Amino acid sequence: MPIKAVIFDLDGTITRPYFDFDAIREQMGLPRDSGPVLESMLKMAPAQRRRAERILHHHEREAVERSELNPGARQTLSALRRMGLRIGVLTRNTRANAVAIARKHDLRFDAIVDREDGPVKPDSFGVLHLCRQFGVEPGQTLLVGDYLFDLLCAKAAGAVAVLLSNNDRANEFAAHADFCIENISEILQIVEQSNRGSTV
């Protein structure tokens, strides 16, 4: 089945890894082993959650201001567009921050799904939503990310899971990936090989 769309995680995939989630948990008063921040916040009392949201928003805004693209990101996005593929972003961040990063780095995405649109990764919602918007099947879609939730999300939706190995935990996640890459530009080779001989 030909690849017709590529969905990217944002933080750590399009941009270089920045967030120190242990520091964020500490500021929120959470144990280091408390699990993902967003899920932990849902369990908080209202006043504690509001404080945690302010802390998270501060770190997210700082991440936008200091964001740098991963090597090859802009060139890869441009090449995918020339190949006629649809390009989406699926992030646990906010739409405002995703748009701010796109503007800062002069990037163009066909669609963005953020944490305010529905259930977040690893739920399959975002992938399925983008596939419907693009008019493609999940099996015609790559999901590229640097964390376990990206891969589980892809698998749950029936998309092709691609792990960008850019952190010291990548080996823990590799078993859940269909492809493992070290540079985002390797996506182009995956698309070309997948589409070679495929009928549209």
Region annotations inferred by a language model:
Residues 1-4, 79-82, 99-200:
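Asp-based, Mg2+/Mn2+-dependent phosphohydrolase catalytic module
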Residues 62-89, 95-103, 124:
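Short, acidic loop-to-helix structural element flanking the phosphoryl-transfer center
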Residues 1-50:
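Active-site neighborhood of HAD-like aspartate-dependent phosphohydrolases
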Residues 24-25, 57-60, 98:
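Hydrophobic alpha-helical core bundles mediating ligand binding, dimerization, or RNAP-core interactions
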Residues 19-20, 72, 149, 186:
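Residue-level recognition of oxygen-bearing side chains
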Residues 49-60, 107-112:
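Short, basic/glycine-rich phosphate-binding loops at helix/coil junctions
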Residues 16, 89-90, 145, 165:
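Small/polar loops that bind or transfer phosphate-bearing groups
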Residues 13, 20, 95, 149, ...:
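Conserved Rossmann-like nucleotide-cofactor binding loop
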